[in-house]
């Protein structure tokens, strides 16, 4: 008769596992819905500020390049935000203004963002917005 190598060692572990109600990871609690909502709200606010920053820096560049007058750019930015249900008041947010100022040197003549890689963009969003 062959002995089952290690079976006498694993049996007490199985009993202990069953007695405790299963593995520890199965006892983890589901995240509190209130905390999940708060985190989602913060992420949404950051995304809104990021979109507003891109809108602002692009509009400012269009004015600086002489393609749009200030009034036209202001209207275009407000429309772009309103189409997504965002108030144009977010353009006056100090965080949005600061991030836009940081991005303006990374735009080319066509007002396209060229001098910023994905890591730098993520850092800007996480640290400034």
Question: Language-model features: where?
Answer:
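Compact alpha-helical subdomains of small soluble proteins
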Residues: 67-129
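Secretory pathway export signals and precursors
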Residues: 1, 55-57, 106-107
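Bacterial N-terminal signal peptides that target proteins for export
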Residues: 2-12
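Short N-proximal segments of mature Sec-exported proteins
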Residues: 30-89
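N-terminal signal peptide c-region/cleavage motif recognized by signal peptidases
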Residues: 20-23
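Hydrophobic helical h-region of N-terminal Sec-dependent signal peptides
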Residues: 13-17
């Amino acid at each position: 008769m062959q002995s089952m190598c290690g079976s006498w060692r694993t049996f007490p572990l199985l009993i202990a596992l069953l007695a405790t109600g299963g593995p520890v990871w199965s006892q983890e609690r589901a995240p509190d819905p209130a905390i999940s909502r708060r985190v989602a709200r913060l992420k949404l606010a950051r995304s809104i500020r990021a979109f507003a920053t891109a809108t602002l820096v692009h509009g400012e560049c269009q004015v600086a390049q002489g393609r749009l007058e200030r009034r036209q750019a202001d209207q275009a930015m407000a429309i772009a935000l309103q189409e997504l249900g965002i108030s144009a008041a977010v353009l006056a947010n100090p965080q949005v203004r600061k991030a836009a100022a940081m991005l303006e040197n990374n735009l080319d003549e066509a007002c396209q963002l060229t001098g910023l890689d994905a890591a730098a963009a993520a850092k800007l969003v996480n640290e400034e917005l």
